[in-house]
Design a protein with these regions (language model features):
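Extended acidic/polar, glycine-enriched regions
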Residues: 177-180, 241, 246-309, 672-673, ...
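Beta-strand/loop-rich accessory regions of lumenal/periplasmic or secreted enzymes
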Residues: 86, 94-98, 103, 144, ...
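Glycine/proline-rich low-complexity spacer/linker segments in large multi-domain proteins
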Residues: 2-37, 45-49, 158-159, 182-215, ...
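Accessory beta-strand-rich segments of carbohydrate-active enzymes
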Residues: 5-14, 30, 48-49, 63-69, ...
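Catalytic cores of secreted or luminal carbohydrate-active enzymes
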Residues: 199-220, 562-620, 624-632, 639-643, ...
Length: 1000
């Protein structure tokens, strides 16, 4: 028994003692340093790192054993049989082990820091490693493990590390034997670090970034720091500091021309003076190449000369005020979970650049080190964020406590001295690894973790480690005092426009302001982006914002019988707690198909804007580019159009200095235009770039140049025959027969040439399938906008030879409640069609009426829609920048925006007319003013009822909604209430619709 006890006490399992110890964060790891991969002398160090002879990538299938609980882990688990395999990198939940969980704020475990549940799930990874002694060390590198890792080589315990998104390096040389070796990594789902990693994401586990072994000489370069200091007239200084050994170095431009050669001794800083330096910015991502020779190793470093500072409350890069047109990004992919390959990361960043995004916040943890190299090359500013978020503290006493300095609320761990070292460690992991990346302009302490001594200490540590960048943190925007001394910018989330404007009026505050999260892009949104843009550009102290967020998060649930991916979200995985589809809040779908919200971002972030000049034919081109002449990179053509199509096409040359304007003349005589006429300027890429091809459409602007005449219905005189019975009114005019039900006060039939055009009665429509931003939807259901009874107070018919008029008074409501709407309507039927004029008075109990209009269920063969209005994609009063006014046509089946959680979609704003047609019949809709419409194969009831898009069932009819008005979509899912100017006016609405039926 004593032998067994001794074996257990010295077993691999016995070494697992650090994951609840906030002072034991990294055991047996090497010191933190800047990211680099050495190459062998004679190799090109700027090639793909996988080509380095000094790097051995261990990605691939590893042996795997999963344990539901650490209690089940054998004492000598490293010698158990590994029958299963799993890809590395990956997350084990994607391979049938354990299950994903989506939680936003709430912790996935009981709040009892630093302790975690006894039943911690464990994934044990194992693989062989061949070793031939050659005098060099073998350094095993993990770039990302969630949540912590215990490492063993052969029978020996090597070490432990936490911080999921930080690099951990172990010198495994002392534990290796010549020939075959066994590497075992035991990964725990939770550790004390879990309390600091409560990010809003689907919770997954495992080795999720690259694993590799570096072969390094005993005496080697351990670390180096590159600083660039800009001078005057194109001069600059390069400050280079090395640690570990002496080096020689050569700096070349991107053509390979040598700019400088120098040497540096271990621990020495060398300063190199340069002239005619090309500067790095998001618009001009010029990189020099620094080749570092250290013994028989060679290291390649790309250097961007740039500086970032605050000048009189303005963020400036290279001396120029900048605006961040940014987005927040998580590592999230439906097939690979947290693992982001080089190709996936590059595709994300290319897509951002193609949509005029110039900045990214790594919410809320450091990304792969390769990600930053891509940002350097493509040109994106980065807020680099520490792996820190503890907003789950707001829930631990059963209520939301968002007082950022309250120990009993969100700031609990920010004030807990047990976590002080852990919080500083996360900052050190961040800064030391990424310190040489020019794309990084802000260091961020983390996200939503309150404020206390630990955060102050973290900020001061970052300042000591790097004085060349700005320090950012959102959770102190409402505090004064110590935050002023360490935070260079004030940061906020989801402020409304008045809050932004009010910031400038604070006499005690003179720092820049950034919205590190704004315009929540969940579902059909964001809808107020243009307004924020206008405020950001109203004052230089506003340095822009970062839309939340880049992608919808999802773990697929399989495929439908038709092969369609079933994207899952919170609640689909059988979790104890979940936050539903709140993770579906991106500008792109999980597969990176753009939402219409991304198209909106592209247009709002456009580099050139056009307004009318003072004289006819003159237009003012204004650039929002800060470093580049827009005329050097963009071509411009224009189209003059009216409701009949394109009238004229031309091209213009232009020249605009950065942040400047110029006047362009386009000869045109507006007196010649009978119809409402528009000019649209289209700006395209002048040449190929790293992210787009020559001719790619970068942006556009459209202006009305002639008012023209409104769409009027031609008067047609035909004989009208009206017959009234106690229950019904029948009106016949030409080939059209209308039947009006007096009890329901509704048209129950419209026949043309004997063919029925209505599958259901024509209805008034007050409801829409709630968008994710429609947080007031519970009021809509309470008032029963979606499900109501109709009361008719009277129906009168007056008829003449060429006209029939039906006047009704009615109300809409539900049992128990007072009517939510009282309506008077006059229906006029004549040879030109059906004319509807109504006056609707609404109850003040309705919280933000979503729409008012009419709805028709038409036969399926009425499948083609043509309209003159905002298109070609969905558009709303506050979400239409990506659209332009024109004549568009589409099959109704193609007019559905397929949000993963079904909701209102594909409305079209600002329409002058709409026709819905079959092969031989056309139904034309107009209104007294511009209107919105929606044509869909799905009813709003179906969209509202189903939780996933793959559950939707098409209606037996095509559903046509013609709206006097549709409320905006906003971003209220996690942002301010919809602005009043985008709401429907109440309590009284006067609306006018006209329906005309004709033969094609």
């Amino acid at each position: 028994m004593d032998i067994l006890k001794l074996a257990a006490e010295n077993s691999p399992r016995s070494k697992m003692i650090y994951h609840e110890d906030t002072q034991a964060l990294h055991i047996g790891t090497l010191d933190k340093h800047c990211y680099f991969v050495p190459f062998a002398k004679g190799q090109d160090p700027f090639e793909d790192r996988k080509n380095s002879q000094r790097m051995e990538l261990l990605n691939g299938n590893w042996g795997f054993r999963y344990y539901d609980s650490i209690i089940d882990l054998e004492d000598d688990f490293i010698h158990e049989k590994f029958e299963d395999t799993i890809p590395v990198p990956s997350n084990w939940q994607l391979y049938g082990y354990d299950k994903p969980q989506y939680t936003n704020v709430c912790y996935p475990i009981p709040f009892d820091p630093p302790f975690v549940p006894d039943d911690i799930p464990v994934g044990v990874y194992q693989r062989e490693y061949d070793y031939s002694p050659d005098g060099m060390d073998r350094v095993l590198v993990f770039e990302g493990v969630d949540s912590c890792v215990y490492l063993y080589v052969n029978d020996s315990f090597v070490g432990y590390s936490q911080v999921s998104h930080a690099t951990a390096e172990f010198n495994i040389t002392p534990y290796l034997a010549e020939g075959r070796n066994i590497i075992t990594a035991a990964v725990l789902k939770w550790c004390d670090g879990t309390y600091l990693e409560d990010q809003d994401k689907i919770r997954l586990s495992g080795i999720f970034r690259d694993v590799y072994v570096l072969s390094r000489p005993k005496m080697r370069l351990e670390n180096y720091i590159v600083k660039t200091i800009l001078g005057e007239n194109g001069s600059a200084r390069l400050e280079f500091t090395v640690f570990g050994c002496d080096v020689s170095a050569k700096l070349c431009d991107d053509d390979g021309v040598t700019m400088a050669q120098f040497s540096a001794y271990d621990g020495e800083s060398v300063e190199i003076k340069l002239e005619n330096v090309k500067l790095w910015s998001a618009e001009t991502p010029y990189l020099y190449r620094l080749t570092i020779n250290a013994g028989d190793e060679v290291i390649g470093e790309e250097i961007g000369f740039r500086d970032v500072k605050v000048d009189k409350g303005v963020v400036k890069i290279n001396g120029k005020a900048v605006k961040f047109k940014g987005v927040n990004r998580h590592d999230s992919y439906p097939d690979t979970g947290y693992y982001a390959s080089y190709e996936q990361m590059k595709a994300d960043l290319v897509l951002m650049k193609k949509h005029n995004i110039n900045a990214v916040r790594t919410s809320h943890y450091p990304n792969s080190p390769v990600f930053y190299q891509l940002c350097d090359r493509l040109g994106l500013y980065v807020i680099d964020e520490a792996d820190l978020e503890s907003h789950g503290c707001v829930e631990v006493y059963y209520d939301y406590k968002w007082d950022y300095s309250d120990y009993n609320g969100i700031a609990m761990l920010a004030c807990d001295e047990r976590f002080g070292n852990a919080i500083k460690d996360r900052a050190e992991c961040l800064v030391k690894r990424d310190i040489n990346r020019p794309c990084v302009v802000f260091w961020s302490l983390g996200n939503e973790s309150g404020y206390g001594k630990n955060m102050l200490d973290e900020a001061e540590l970052i300042k000591r480690l790097d004085d060349t960048r700005l320090v950012h943190y959102e959770s102190t925007h409402c505090l004064d005092g110590t935050s002023d001394s360490v935070l260079d910018v004030v940061s906020g989330m989801y402020w409304d426009l008045n809050g932004l404007k009010g910031y400038l009026e604070k006499p005690e505050e003179n720092r820049p302001l950034v919205q590190c999260e704004y315009c929540h892009a969940m579902g059909n949104g964001p809808g107020d982006l243009e307004d924020y843009h206008n405020v950001f550009y109203s004052n230089e102290r506003f340095c822009g914002g970062f839309v939340w967020e880049w992608c919808d998060h999802s773990v697929p649930l399989g495929k439908t019988a038709e092969g369609r991916i079933k994207y899952g979200y919170g609640g689909d995985f059988g979790e104890r707690h979940n936050d539903g589809n709140f993770c579906m809040d991106g500008l792109v779908y999980p597969d990176r198909t753009p939402h219409t919200g991304l198209l909106e971002v592209k247009q709002v972030y456009r580099p050139v804007r056009v307004t009318k000049g003072e004289s006819e034919g003159n237009f003012v081109f204004s650039s929002t580019l800060e470093f580049v002449n827009a005329g050097d990179i963009l071509d411009c053509r224009y189209e003059i159009t009216d409701k009949n199509g394109i009238i004229y096409i031309g091209r213009v040359d232009f020249d605009i200095e950065p942040m400047g304007s110029t006047v362009v003349n386009v000869p045109n005589d507006t007196a010649e235009y009978e119809n409402e006429t528009f000019i649209r300027f289209i700006f395209t890429a002048k040449e190929d770039t790293d992210y787009c091809e020559n001719g790619y459409e970068v942006c556009f602007d459209q202006l009305r140049i002639a008012e023209g005449k409104a769409c009027k219905v031609a008067e047609v005189k035909e004989n009208v025959k009206a017959v009234e019975t106690p229950l019904c009114i029948t009106v016949a005019v030409g080939d059209v027969v209308y039947r009006f039900d007096k009890r329901k006060s509704a048209f129950i039939s419209v026949k043309f040439g004997g063919r029925e055009l209505l599958d259901r009665p024509l209805q008034y429509n007050f409801f829409r399938a709630p968008t994710d931003n429609d947080v007031m939807k519970y009021n809509w259901y309470k008032v029963h906008l979606n499900d109501f009874d109709v009361k008719s107070y009277g129906c009168e018919l007056s008829a003449s030879e060429n006209r029939a008029e039906i006047s009704v008074t009615q109300s809409f409501g539900w049992s128990i409640q007072q009517p939510f709407c009282r309506l008077k309507a006059v229906y006029v039927i004549d040879g030109s069609g059906l004319d509807i004029k109504c006056e609707a008075e609404f109850s003040n109990k309705i919280d933000m009426l979503p729409r008012f209009g009419i709805r028709l269920f038409m036969p399926k063969d009425f499948s083609r829609a043509e309209y003159f209005g905002y298109g070609p994609t969905e558009s709303y009063i506050d979400k239409r920048q990506a659209c332009y006014i024109g004549r568009f046509a589409a099959d109704i089946g193609d007019m559905h925006e397929d949000y993963i959680r079904p909701q209102e979609n594909s409305s079209h704003y600002g329409c002058r007319y709409l026709t819905v047609s079959s092969e031989d019949t056309s139904v034309m809709f107009t209104a007294g003013e511009e209107f919105s419409f929606n044509a869909s194969q799905f009813s709003q009831e179906e969209l509202a009822a189903k939780a996933h898009n793959y559950e939707l069932e098409r209606c037996e009819s095509n559903v046509i909604c013609v709206d006097y008005a549709m409320a905006g979509v906003g971003s209220n899912s996690c942002g301010p209430r919809l602005a009043e100017k985008y709401q429907l006016e109440k309590p009284l609405i006067n609306a006018h619709f006209h329906i005309q039926i004709s033969k094609i």
